[in-house]
Regions:
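...with weaker cross-activation on analogous glycine-rich loops/strands in unrelated enzymes
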Residues: 1-48
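Low-complexity, Gly/Ser/Thr/Pro-rich intrinsically disordered linker/tail segments
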Residues: 46-117
Length: 117
């Protein structure tokens, strides 16, 4: 499965939905999701199951920088959200992608979201 920023994923056997913030070079994905403890920027392992992924590193970087207290209390965990999820994607004729986020890697998407240079 190819993941792009803005994809909405819904669990097939679980009641869970997450938003893709973009893929990383190693195939992992930075995600935005809510759990009982609250909303998190998180990351997936790589498609091969490697938990030391670029997405987890990037999620930790942004959670530490912008939400340090929250991240210390509820640290990023490497959940595998890459399997058994249905995918929904908006297209430009329905929802305009002003910054072309859907064609960017997660590190660039995060810079735009957090207005970094």
């Amino acid at each position: 499965t190819e993941y792009k920023a803005g994809d909405i994923m819904s669990g097939e056997n679980v009641s869970h939905v997450w938003l893709s913030l973009g893929p990383c070079n190693d195939g992992s994905v930075v995600i935005l999701h809510s759990s009982p403890s609250g909303v998190h920027i998180s990351g997936t392992p790589t498609p091969k199951g490697i938990e030391n992924s670029q997405a987890i590193d990037l999620a930790n970087k942004y959670m530490d920088k912008y939400y340090p207290v929250w991240n210390k209390k509820y640290p990023v965990k490497p959940f595998d959200y890459l399997e058994k999820y249905s995918q929904f994607r908006w297209y430009d004729n329905v929802l305009y992608d002003k910054y072309n986020l859907k064609n960017m890697y997660a590190d660039n998407v995060m810079k735009i979201i957090f207005e970094e240079k």
